[in-house]
């Protein structure tokens, strides 16, 4: 079991097939489960799945965001580090990987959720853009006291931008502060002797 405090970031890490995405599906009531999920107060969830194929859709950034909300589009783009004047009329198909991920994050937060779920939020972006996106999410959390849960394979980056980690590997599950979970001895218990900590 684990508990996530309001206004903190939980990174969920582990190998493919460990159950990370299934955990998100459970939190979204999209999969059956046993046990109990308790939310403190009213919860409104914003969600960006691991693969959301929107780049082939022939619509602009403005049109895409308008499917969810027509208010505060410019402010929402600014909050994820994008220039609204430059981006609004651009087609989704011409955006870089980093720009598209930021637009998807804007889509997730445009209706003011208090919990954000990101399944691999930096898929398909280069290392510099990856770190910039995590930094942006950290700043967003600080400004709005939003609670963020994110799935990532890159524990070396998310350790710097998360308050807590849930490390999953088959039957082994460990939850705690990120620095504690990153302890090399614990990582070897979770992932085996082949793990390399840098």
Q: What kind of region is each of these model predictions?
A:
Residues 165-178:
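H-loop (His-switch) and adjacent beta-strand-loop-beta switch element
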Residues 105:
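Hydrophobic anchor residue at the start of the ABC signature
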Residues 91-95, 99:
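Conserved ABC ATPase signature
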């Amino acid at each position: 079991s684990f508990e996530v405090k309001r206004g903190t970031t939980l990174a969920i890490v582990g190998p493919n097939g460990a159950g990370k995405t299934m955990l998100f599906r459970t939190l979204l009531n999209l999969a059956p489960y046993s046990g109990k999920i308790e939310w403190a107060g009213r919860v409104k969830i914003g969600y960006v799945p691991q693969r959301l194929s929107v780049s082939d859709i022939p619509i602009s950034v403005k049109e895409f965001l308008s499917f969810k909300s027509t208010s505060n589009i410019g402010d929402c783009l600014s909050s994820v580090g994008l220039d609204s004047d430059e981006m609004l009329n651009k087609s989704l198909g011409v955006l870089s990987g980093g720009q598209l991920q930021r637009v998807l994050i804007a889509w997730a937060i445009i209706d003011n959720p208090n919990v954000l779920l990101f399944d691999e939020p930096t898929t398909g972006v280069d290392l510099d853009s990856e770190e910039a996106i995590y930094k942006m999410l950290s700043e967003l959390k600080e400004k709005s006291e939003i609670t963020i849960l994110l799935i990532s394979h890159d524990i070396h980056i998310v350790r710097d931008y998360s308050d807590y980690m849930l490390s999953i590997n088959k039957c082994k599950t460990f939850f705690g502060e990120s620095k504690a979970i990153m302890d090399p001895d614990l990582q070897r218990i979770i992932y085996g002797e082949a793990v390399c900590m840098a």
